Regions:
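N-terminal secretory signal peptides
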Residues: 1-22
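Short acidic, glycine-rich surface-loop motifs adjacent to enzyme active sites
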Residues: 203-219
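N-terminal active-site segment of His-dependent metallophosphoesterases
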Residues: 26, 42-118, 197
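N-terminal export leaders
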Residues: 18-44
């Protein structure tokens, strides 16, 4: 597996991606799914069931975000996280198009054991896509500072597993903010310096998409829902006309816009957390019978070259 640096045509493996042949050989990874559409360098959100204003053409970029599969979790509110994870994969394969790639935005596993990582790989091998990317969650780094995760999913990446790649005119940055945790997520000086150098030569009209597990904005710091040094990265991204940050971790949909930067938190495929401040903390929330899937989902994103918007569409798990 190679590391995605500046693969502008989007057809190769990328520095962190897998082609279909590698995927079948090595497997891949997964999470709660979300569909985003990039149009003209800007991300546009859509309500599920609404008409997509930018019908996809052959030059469009279409990718899927999934998050927080927590394979290995056993207990209420979801006694079968493998089943809901599998349902999300099936839903991705039934979208009616082949995604250019799928991103799992962390907490692939619950306890980061070799068996759990292997199970995620085997399940993700079902996905009909050419490339799969991941960023780690804190549950993927238990006891070994992320070593087992990097061995399974992040070979040939930089530092603790960060990387970037280009495709369809969009620049993607995948960050790791789940190591060296105290109260909040943390990037560290080496990774911040990587971002500075990575974007230095980019034109300000280049659409930017940033993946991380923990939100880069202060969603609810009391519960650890934020990144203590993210402001240094966000300040560097202010010069770009369109920046979209996609994260997991909070187990619920949430959108916030700050100037040119829009943040989208993804639904999980395992179980929801309470809304910020509604309860003692971010613990699995038990829902009434038959309501679990309403809190789970996938996300798709679409981008049309020459336009100035990313279209983000969140779908409940069916």
């Amino acid at each position: 597996m190679t590391v995605p640096t500046r693969n502008s045509d989007g057809d190769g493996d990328g520095e962190h991606g897998m082609n279909r042949r590698q995927l079948m050989r090595h497997s891949a990874w997964f999470g709660g799914a979300v569909i985003l559409t990039v149009t003209g360098g800007e991300v546009i959100s859509h309500i599920p069931g609404s008409t997509d204003p930018t019908p996809a053409g052959s030059a469009d970029l279409r990718f899927v975000q999934v998050s927080d599969s927590h394979i290995g979790f056993h207990g209420p509110p979801n006694m079968n996280v493998t089943g809901t994870f599998s349902a999300a994969l099936t839903q991705i394969n039934s979208l009616g198009f082949r995604p250019d790639f799928v991103m799992h935005s962390g907490d692939l596993t619950h306890l980061s054991t070799p068996a759990q990582f292997d199970q995620v790989k085997q399940m993700l091998s079902q996905l009909r896509t050419d490339r799969i990317f991941t960023v780690p969650g804190e549950h993927d780094s238990i006891g070994d500072n992320g070593r087992a995760y990097r061995q399974a999913f992040a070979k040939n990446t930089l530092g603790d597993g960060w990387y970037s790649f280009d495709t369809h005119g969009v620049h993607f940055i995948a960050l790791v903010n789940t190591l060296h945790l105290e109260q909040l997520g943390h990037l560290g000086s080496d990774q911040i310096d990587f971002v500075r150098k990575d974007i230095a030569g980019l034109s300000s009209d280049t659409p930017i998409v940033v993946f991380s597990h923990i939100p880069l904005f202060a969603m609810y710091p009391k519960w650890g829902w934020g990144t203590d040094d993210a402001v240094q990265v966000l300040s560097m991204l202010r010069r770009f006309s369109s920046v979209t940050c996609l994260n997991g971790h909070v187990h619920q949909l949430f959108t916030k816009t700050e100037g040119n930067i829009t943040f989208h938190s993804a639904a999980p495929t395992c179980y929801p957390f309470p809304k910020p401040g509604q309860g003692p903390g971010p613990i699995p929330q038990v829902l009434p019978a038959g309501r679990l899937k309403d809190a789970l989902g996938i996300r798709t994103v679409n981008y049309r070259q020459g336009s100035h918007a990313l279209a983000v569409k969140d779908e409940k798990l069916t």
